[in-house]
Amino acid sequence: MDGYAVRAEAMEKRYGEKRALDGFDLAVGEGTVHGLLGPNGAGKTTAVRILSTLVRLDGGRATVAGLDVARQPREVRARIGLTGQYAAVDEVLTGRQNLEMFGRLFHLGGRRARLRATELLEQFDLTDAGDRGVGKYSGGMRRRLDLAASMILAPAVLFLDEPTTGLDPRSRGEVWESVRALVAGGTTVLLTTQYLEEADKLASRITVIDQGRAIADDTPDGLKNLVGGDRIEVVVAERAEIPRVVKVVARVADGEPEADETESRVHAPVTDRVTALTEVARTLQDEGVRVEDIGLRRPSLDDVFLRLTGHRTENTEAKEAA
């Protein structure tokens, strides 16, 4: 498989006059988590649906586990797992019964389905809850059960389409641990997500998609370097102090300081991070400027997203509108 579990070359998909994918390229290394990020309507879910054989492509070529998705869809389906935004489990059944049902649907037979259900309950830390109704599970437990169901046939490639949407931070963390364990066991994961933190923590490489095209592909740190290195940030108590802060920060900055008056914030790129922070903090104190917060930060993936697409992620915009 030339070291890649998923390959897409000039992939196209049209819905009437709309091009959902317009020459989309992707290369996902074996045994890795690869993040797919993009604004709403960028083509993320369309790409996953094509790669998982749910939708036919209109142009280009794609392979999964070395198999052509257009010419060998049945063989591809035997090598993949797919989990969407919502847990596809029956709340009336127990966790064990759900997994046994999926096993029988995949023609494992009764005995093998029962054995596989027991293995997966243990693998996803659900043994104690295995005989409880899924309706009594927490959100994180349901998502882990959904992941377990997608692993019934031990697929080589797992597609996770926004798997933690709507979960609280603790439940998201539980799902992340399950994903890490799968990858440690050799599974390749293609992850679409609206949580920048999720991609940063899980993905070893990220592709940014916008208007149906891949506009960037790199490691999380490599993408962050697109918008510069470390930055010093100062938040002051009074907006009137911003001009003075800009002058102080400019003395240590590697570029022009930027001021955000709505948040009383000044920030600028720096190279000698510790010296810059120390000097700015001391000078502002000596000049009697009331500082509410001061620190250093690395660019976030949200900064990258904003730089590349011109706007923030849906998740960030929703928070700001709240």
Swiss-Prot record:
Topology in the lipid bilayer is annotated as:
Peripheral membrane protein
Q: Can you say where in the cell this protein is located?
A: Cell membrane
Q: Start and end of every ABC transporter domain?
A: 6-236
Q: Which InterPro entries match?
A: AAA+_ATPase, ABC_transporter-like_ATP-bd, ABC_transporter-like_CS, ABC_transporter_ATP-binding, DrrA, DrrA1-3-like_C, P-loop_NTPase
Gene ablation phenotype (knockout): Deletion of the drrA2-drrB2 operon decreases by 33% the daunorubicin (DNR) titer in cell culture. The drrA2-drrB2 mutant is more sensitive to DNR. Deletion of the drrA1-drrB1, drrA2-drrB2 and drrA3-drrB3 operons almost blocks DNR production in cell culture, suggesting that disruption of these operons impairs the efflux of DNR, resulting in intracellular accumulation.
Q: Give GO BP annotations, semicolon-separated.
A: daunorubicin transport; doxorubicin transport; response to antibiotic
Signal sequence annotation: none
Q: Which reaction does it catalyse?
A: daunorubicin(in) + ATP + H2O = daunorubicin(out) + ADP + phosphate + H(+)
Q: Which UniProt keywords apply?
A: Antibiotic resistance, ATP-binding, Cell membrane, Membrane, Nucleotide-binding, Translocase, Transport
Which family is annotated? Belongs to the ABC transporter superfamily. Drug exporter-1 (DrugE1) (TC 3.A.1.105) family.
Q: What does this protein do?
A: Part of the ABC transporter complex DrrA2B2 involved in daunorubicin efflux. Responsible for energy coupling to the transport system. Confers self-resistance to daunorubicin, an antibiotic produced by S.coeruleorubidus.
Name of the protein this chain belongs to: Daunorubicin resistance ATP-binding protein DrrA2
Gene name as annotated: drrA2
